[in-house]
């Protein structure tokens, strides 16, 4: 297994799909990384040489991925909550942030129904 950005990349998958196992790398970014590295999309990771894997590592290192990306996202949410803006309040209360209705639906964000106690 090749190790890129601290993640074990599956050997038996095509390079385009295998790179998506890195947090922050989807199909589009994966294709861009492979094009920049000069590697075909349909080749399997196990067929790549060490030099090609090193170029992949260098290309992935140019992007914010994995722990840095997670930290960046959580810090931006924390910043909104500290500001006390509308989006921050919605995050703090665990409600939908982007204007969805909450009278019905929004169960995923609000959690399970709480029974009414008499």
UniProtKB/Swiss-Prot annotation:
Keywords, sorted A to Z: Ribonucleoprotein, Ribosomal protein, RNA-binding, rRNA-binding, tRNA-binding
Pfam families to which the protein is assigned, alphabetical: Ribosomal_S13
Biological-process GO terms, alphabetical: translation
GO MF term set: rRNA binding; structural constituent of ribosome; tRNA binding
Record InterPro entries: Rbsml_uS13_C, Ribosomal_uS13, Ribosomal_uS13-like_H2TH, Ribosomal_uS13_bac-type, Ribosomal_uS13_CS
Key word Glycoprotein present: no
GO CC terms in record: cytosol; small ribosomal subunit
Protein family (similarity comment): Belongs to the universal ribosomal protein uS13 family.
Alphabetized NCBIfam families for the sequence: uS13_bact
Its biological purpose: Located at the top of the head of the 30S subunit, it contacts several helices of the 16S rRNA. In the 70S ribosome it contacts the 23S rRNA (bridge B1a) and protein L5 of the 50S subunit (bridge B1b), connecting the 2 subunits; these bridges are implicated in subunit movement. Contacts the tRNAs in the A and P-sites.
Listed HAMAP family: Ribosomal_uS13
Subunit structure and binding partners: Part of the 30S ribosomal subunit. Forms a loose heterodimer with protein S19. Forms two bridges to the 50S subunit in the 70S ribosome.
UniProt protein name: Small ribosomal subunit protein uS13
Organism, as annotated: Salmonella typhi
Lineage: Bacteria, Pseudomonadati, Pseudomonadota, Gammaproteobacteria, Enterobacterales
